[in-house]
Amino acid sequence: MKTTIILILLTHWVYSQNPTSGNNTATLCLGHHAVANGTLVKTITDDQIEVTNATELVQSTSIGKICNNPYRVLDGRNCTLIDAMLGDPHCDVFQYENWDLFIERSSAFSNCYPYDIPDYASLRSIVASSGTLEFTAEGFTWTGVTQNGRSGACRRGSADSFFSRLNWLTKSGNSYPTLNVTMPNNNNFDKLYIWGIHHPSTNNEQTKLYVQELGRVTVSTKRSQQTIIPNIGSRPGVRGQSGRISIYWTIVKPGDILMINSNGNLVAPRGYFKMRTGKSSIMRSDAPIDTCVSECITPNGSIPNDKPFQNVNKVTYGKCPKYIKQNTLKLATGMRNVPEKQIRGIFGAIAGFIENGWEGMVDGWYGFRYQNSEGTGQAADLKSTQAAIDQINGKLNRVIERTNEKFHQIEKEFSEVEGRIQDLEKYVEDTKIDLWSYNAELLVALENQHTIDLTDAEMNKLFEKTRRQLRENAEDMGNGCFKIYHKCDNACIGSIRNGTYDHYIYRDEALNNRFQIKGVELKSGYKDWILWISFAISCFLICVVLLGFIMWACQKGNIRCNICI
């Protein structure tokens, strides 16, 4: 009886051991790289899926300063572009300046006779895109009037002065004759003329300066005509002046003629600005300008353009990422992450990719782990790794190429009377941003889905390649591992990895070992049940033996049993 019990317990222990730990078998598992803490990305089918690595696609911060390279950035300091163009005394340093981007500061102010420009935004945009304040004086003949009017509101140094690009005409003696002046454009470029009309604060000031009780200014070309009549009346005082000057502008094409007719209140041009076509622009910003390199500028400062999208500012200049609403979009640049289970059981069994990934595999994305007579080991499969990396590399650059703007997004400005146009423009811009935000999210989700499917496919391809090599010499264990039924040392494992494994060499040995092991080994589907039954029978037999011993001892008188009621 004792012998039977010992044999049953021994058999139970033997069945509990790892059947692949012998010298005549080996275990080969295929797996992929994993990390302890992956990155969540969005795909077409999942809002959140964990991958081993991902790249942020949205630039959400600027460097806090505007780089002056590779663009010529002109700091307007205390001057607006229009004041610099008109020749405000405190902006004389900007005469004949050139720029790619003119930076207007919030601290900019006018320091001359108070003026308004009915179409300020258009004039500002035209001058900004020209990229220069190059000015050419012309010999206008103003007969019978006094030129070079001045004002105490516009001082140049300690003397009264006026805008350097404009000529304020007043009466000569007690007369102001009707003026008729023409100026042809015989050049092959457009000319921009700036002129204006003075609005006195009182009728007395009107006759004192221009004799006539009501003046008039008409400026014409072959294509256009503007007639302006002064609005006489008191206005809030600015730098001691309650009068105003309204500034207008006229573009004269090659072969056209500029005609000026006036009987009073004319602020005449002194020459023209040469119009240029280019990609120069203007931007309002208080960010400091520094010596650095950046191809994208926003009012918040320059930003890198190595990402396809940005959430810093809608207004940009240069080669910039596309503006979207999202603060973050992550592009998967690694495979699906399945963190490795830290506890593998009593015998430290290895597991394949079906169960989890492998942490610590730094030399490749896909690889092998094995157990054989020489111990355990791990090696990466560089071919499948490179195949996946080659297809993922360049993905970010392709997204950038599709989305980076090669032009600047200018500020949209409209006068108060164009409120409906401004509302429409805002609606169009917001709609464009909404569409781009949606397209960006969809594009990234598609790319992420493709990356994950691609890396999964490479894993399956490697598994199928290994299975075709091993054939009947091994059995698929269902967890990404193969049980090899012949002795397979490290050299043998290496031949499987590099594709030189010859299954015919090991075929006979594998078949013999398979039959021998199958005679003892139990299929995993029934093994647990048999082990539990064996354990139950063992316990039952122990109880029977113990009960028989007690009964035998009672009969011999070695044990006395008293039952008390």
UniProtKB/Swiss-Prot annotation:
Predominant location category: virion
Superkingdom assignment: Viruses
Site features described as Cleavage, chain residue numbers: 344-345
Signal peptide range in chain numbering: 1-16
Extracellular side stretches: 17-529
MF terms in GO: host cell surface receptor binding
Topology term for the membrane: Single-pass type I membrane protein
Cellular compartments per GO CC: host cell plasma membrane; membrane; viral envelope; virion membrane
Keyword Transferase: no
Subcellular location: Virion membrane; Host apical cell membrane
PTM comment: Palmitoylated.
Cited Pfam families: Hemagglutinin (PF00509)
Glycosylation: residue positions: 23, 37, 53, 78, 180, 300, 498
InterPro entries assigned to the protein according to its UniProt record, in alphabetical order: Capsid_hemagglutn, Hemagglutn_HA1_a/b_dom_sf, Hemagglutn_influenz_A, Hemagglutn_influenz_A/B
Misc note: Major glycoprotein, comprises over 80% of the envelope proteins present in virus particle.
Family: Belongs to the influenza viruses hemagglutinin family.
Subunit structure: Homotrimer of disulfide-linked HA1-HA2.
The protein's name in its UniProt record: Hemagglutinin
Organism: Influenza A virus (strain A/Equine/Fontainebleau/1976 H3N8) (Influenza A virus (strain A/Equine/France/1/1976 H3N8))
